Amino acid sequence: ELLEQGKEEEAAKLASEAEAADGVQVEEQDTSSIDEKRKALPKEAKYLYKYLSVNPAGGQIVNILQTIKMDSNRTKNLVVLGLHGFGLANIGEDFARTYLDLGWCKNAAKAKISAKGINSASKDKLTGAMNKLKGGCLIIENAGLVRPDKFKEIIELCAPEKSDVKIILTGEKVALSNMLADNMSQARHFNNRVYFDQIQEANMVDIAKGYMSEKGYKPESGMSGTIKNLLMSMETGNIDRLLKAVDDGIARAEARDPLSKKLLKADIQ
């Protein structure tokens, strides 16, 4: 079993908490709640641990994975809604990795494309791309700008009976919500939604430090302050840019000492 017996009940409780938290700004994160969410997830979801402090996203992540586990016929397509039309692709990639490890994707292949790229591509080009991606994941950035005709087209090409590609839409909350509302026939394929539009500075710090741990690195004492300083030069909620800064820091640490697995504050710039 991918999930231990009894976790479904725990996940249902967490999902209720997440729904109650929707629309509420939380100033302090309850670490016990984060631990509960983490325990409710299978080990294959380790790439998603770093996002669990975000409300309501953390509870929604647990709920989505548990719901799909209990209902194998449920769509695995996903919508990630944030503050911008950019900066969320890494979340989509982490879901793609999780889907692969859980056996929900049959192919490790994943591709990122912008709404502009979808809109400008011919049907033949999209068909060829989806055939190459067969069994994998497609992440569409700034998806609120996808044209209705191209949205319908890509859903048809990615259907289980065709290329069986899981679609992950990312984008700004209002634009993406409106796009789905204007395309109700297609929107029924996207019942799994995760909201990152209430993300706060403390969540961004948690994500960065969680990513360091995920990569096997131990941060120097006082790293939280360094991350906060880094965030001052970034758009609020731009997770992609934050994780790129951590990757760059890890590259500096490896160049300095490839064995210590120690990340210094000076590495994060």
Please place each PLM-identified region on the residue numbering.
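A short helix-turn-beta junction within AAA+ P-loop NTPase domains corresponding to the substrate/partner-engaging
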Residues: 181-202
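AAA+/P-loop NTPase substrate/partner-engagement loops
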Residues: 98-129
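Walker A/P-loop
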Residues: 77-107
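Conserved alpha-helical scaffold flanking the Walker A/P-loop in AAA+ ATPase domains
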Residues: 65, 69, 119-145, 149-159
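Conserved AAA+ ATPase small/helical "lid" subdomain
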Residues: 204-268
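Pre-Walker A (pre-P-loop) alpha-helix and adjacent loop at the N terminus of AAA/AAA+ ATPase modules
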Residues: 36-77
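Conserved catalytic/switch belt of AAA+ P-loop NTPases
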Residues: 146-174, 178-187
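Conserved ASCE P-loop NTPase core motifs with emphasis on AAA+ ATPases
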Residues: 17-49
